[in-house]
Regions:
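Short beta-strand segments
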Residues: 1, 35, 61-65
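N-terminal start-of-chain detector that recognizes signal peptides
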Residues: 3-8, 33-35, 148-152, 198-200
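Glycine/charged-rich beta-loop-alpha catalytic/anionic-binding loops adjacent to active sites
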Residues: 27-32, 170-171
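Flexible glycine/proline-rich, aromatic-decorated loop/lid segments
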Residues: 1-28
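Flexible, low-complexity linker and terminal segments
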Residues: 45, 50-216
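Short, well-ordered, mixed-charge alpha-helical segments that flank or form enzyme active sites
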Residues: 4-6, 41-42, 69-72
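Conserved structured core elements
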Residues: 12-15, 39-43, 182, 210
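Active-site/ligand-binding-proximal alpha/beta "capping" segment
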Residues: 30-51
Length: 216
């Protein structure tokens, strides 16, 4: 992210791309948007982002900026066991027993089984037009409604159960509470620490979509 319009300040920091990332697209679809504020968050959130993208088969965005990219400091060694990326693909052994494979199968979670071409005997069809469960083009209104429900409402519900909790700092007795996301973490924390005459706290969001309303 950088100040705009056009190329703007390509080596400076801004957060003006948020609305674009939240809403741009052809029609509605589920997505997740992460906004890490520290080096540690950037590392662990990236692992989480890959897992959410693989599990729900959706686009996931990590919004950073020059300030975070250029920052450096001493940190604790990353815990590599804290998060590992899972692929959520039908295993090669299970693929051998898969018959009548439906790439866009209707499920309770909205997540369709994902197979690797050549691992199963069936042909895998994928289409960018509205499609049937098998992947063939369709203009059937009922199927279209079910597909929207599958890939948006059901997936959104699942993603909402795996939200990153906001970071709260000095909220007890605070007269002013700052709210921010991304690299504003550092400046908000410093303001709270140096404010001698006012009680100031902050809430930092490392995930802005789905919005963590239940955690606020």
């Amino acid at each position: 992210q950088r100040p705009a319009p056009a190329t703007g300040f390509p080596t400076r920091t801004a957060q003006a791309d948020l609305e674009f990332v939240l809403h741009a697209g052809h029609g509605e679809f589920a997505r997740a948007v992460y906004t890490p504020g520290t080096i540690e968050e950037a590392f662990y959130v990236t692992i989480k982002a890959f897992n959410i993208a693989e599990k729900y088969q959706i686009p996931v965005f990590i919004m950073t900026d020059q300030h975070l990219a250029d920052s450096y400091r001493n940190i604790e060694t990353f815990d590599l066991d804290k998060g590992k990326v899972q692929r959520y693909i039908i295993s090669k052994d299970d693929s051998k027993n898969t018959k009548n494979y439906k790439r866009y199968q209707f499920t309770e979670s909205g997540i369709s089984p994902r197979a690797i071409p050549s691992w199963i005997e069936d042909v895998i069809y994928a289409d960018s037009d509205e499609h049937t469960e098998e992947g063939h083009i369709t203009e059937d209104a009922d199927i279209g409604r079910k597909m929207v429900e599958k890939r948006f409402y059901k997936k959104f519900s699942g993603i909402s159960q795996e939200i990153e909790r906001p970071t709260a700092y000095k909220l007890g007795g605070a007269d002013v509470v700052l709210l921010g996301f991304g690299s504003t973490y550092g400046v908000m924390k410093e303001v709270c620490d140096v404010a001698d005459d006012r009680k100031i706290g902050f809430i930092h969001l490392s995930q802005v979509w789905p919005f963590p309303a239940s955690e606020m």
